[in-house]
Design a protein with these regions (language model features):
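Long, hydrophobic N-terminal alpha-helical segment
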Residues: 1-25
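Intrinsically disordered, low-complexity regions enriched in small/polar residues
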Residues: 5, 9, 21, 40, ...
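Generic detector of contiguous secondary-structure segments
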Residues: 18-31, 66-71
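Glycine-rich beta-strand-turn "strand-cap" elements at beta-sheet edges
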Residues: 31, 35-62, 88-117
Length: 117
């Protein structure tokens, strides 16, 4: 059964091009590791909520944009084995590949697919 990793982050709006380049590089790395599908999206209509929302969850500042991303793996087992190797990959070191956003405010998680049509 497919497995999905999902991410939400706040990226400085001025860093859109840098974020796209960064994401394209990571998409290639994840594809090497076995990801079936890698998607990065740039927030266009992401309203602030009263109780909770994407912007609130990542403490989005006025000069930032929310990004929503996910990748699909063949299975959780493939994903777990790949992440073990990816965490040792020097390309994941922020000193080697600096993040164009504040990674401390990124939220992420792994999900089993319930419906896929």
């Amino acid at each position: 059964m497919h497995y999905v990793d999902g991410f939400v982050a706040a990226v400085p709006t001025a860093n859109r091009d840098a974020y796209k380049k960064y994401s394209e590089g990571f998409a290639a790395i994840f594809k090497e590791a076995g990801v079936l599908h890698y998607v990065e999206t740039w927030g266009v209509d992401v309203p602030e909520g009263k109780l909770t929302s994407f912007p609130m969850a990542v403490q989005c500042k006025p000069d930032e944009t929310v990004v929503f991303s996910w990748m699909t793996w063949p299975s959780k087992e493939v994903r777990d084995a790949a992440w073990d190797q990816l965490m040792k990959d020097p390309r994941f070191d922020p000193a080697v590949t600096p993040m164009p956003f504040d990674g401390k405010r990124m939220i992420f998680g792994g999900f089993e697919v319930l419906v896929n049509r």
